[in-house]
Amino acid sequence: MQIFKRISMMIGLLLLTATMAFADAKTHKIAFHVDESDPKVMNMALNNVQNVSNYYAGKGEKVIIELVAYGPGLNMFVKGKSPVEDRISVMSMSVDGLTFSACGNTHRKMSEKAGKDVALIDGVGMAPSGVVRLVELQEQGYAYVRP
C-alpha cells in the first residue's frame, strides 16, 4: 500500500511540475507592419518573422505573430502580383502562430480601381482596417515592429 501512495505522490509532483513549467512559459505576441510596395521591405519583414519564430521556437517558447499590410504594402498579398507570394504561401503553412492580415479598406479601393475583386494569396485574412487592426493588436499587448 505504501508503494501506491509513493507512486501517486510522484505522479502528482510530476503533473504539478509540468503544469508550473507550462504556466511559466511566456507567449510572445508581435505585430509586423508593412505599408510599402518595396520587395526589399517585404522580404525584410518576412525575414524578421522567420527569425523571431525560429528564435523563440529554439527556446521552447510560444510566439504569436500577425503581419498586417495596408496601402501600397497590400501588394505583398495580391495573388499573381506579390514578389513574395511563394514565401507567404510556404510560411503560412510552416510557421506556427503566424497570421497574415490584409487591410479591407485598401483591398476595397484596389478592387474598385481594378473593376474586379483583387484576389489575395491563399492563407491571407482580411481585417476591416489595417491601421485599426494594428491599434487593436497593440492594445492586446503585441509588440510593434515596422521593418
Annotated model-derived regions:
Residues 10-19:
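Bacterial N-terminal signal peptides
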Residues 25, 58-63, 95:
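Short helix-terminating capping/connector loops at secondary-structure junctions
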Residues 33-60:
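N-terminal targeting signals for Sec/Tat export/insertion, comprising classic cleavable signal peptides
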Residues 78-147:
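A cross-taxonomic marker for long C-terminal extensions/tails that follow the last structured domain
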Residues 1-11:
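Bacterial N-terminal signal peptides that target proteins for export
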Residues 24-37, 68-72:
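Acidic/histidine-rich, surface-exposed loop or edge segments in extracytoplasmic proteins
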Residues 31-33, 66-69, 99-102, 145-146:
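Structural recognition of the beta-strand scaffold that forms the well-ordered cores
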Residues 63-77, 106:
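Acidic helix-start/capping segments at beta-turn-to-alpha-helix junctions
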